[in-house]
Swiss-Prot record:
Toxic component of a type II toxin-antitoxin (TA) system. Its toxic effect is neutralized by coexpression with cognate antitoxin RelB1 but no other ParD or RelB antitoxin. The keyword RNA-binding does not apply. The lineage of its organism: Bacteria, Pseudomonadati, Pseudomonadota, Alphaproteobacteria, Caulobacterales. This is Toxin RelE1. It comes from the Bacteria. It comes from Caulobacter vibrioides (strain ATCC 19089 / CIP 103742 / CB 15).
């Protein structure tokens, strides 16, 4: 079964914020991060249940990058994956 991935406005803002922050510090790393996160989002169409459960319908995947990782949190609702947030693993949350 193929799932539809829907990215919330807030998650899109998270994505852009993370890229802008990294571009200011390391443009080459930022050029790698964008496609990496996009590939992770695309992978949810085929295997959304691979993320760890953090609630009844909420899951998250960790995407290694450098010495840390980025986190994508999402909800499974029927045949849809609703991405709610994206953040760097070292962010104060």
């Amino acid at each position: 079964m193929t799932f539809t991935v829907l990215v919330s406005v807030r998650a899109k803002r998270d994505f852009n914020r993370l890229i802008v922050w990294l571009v200011e510090r390391d443009p080459r790393a930022a050029a790698r991060l964008g496609p990496l996160l996009e590939a992770a989002l695309d992978s949810l169409t085929e295997a959304p249940s691979r993320g760890r459960s953090v609630g009844p319908t909420t899951r998250e995947i960790s995407i290694p990058f450098g010495q840390s990782a980025y986190v994508i949190r999402y909800r499974l609702l029927g045949s849809s994956v609703h991405v709610t947030r994206i953040w760097h693993g070292l962010e104060q949350r």
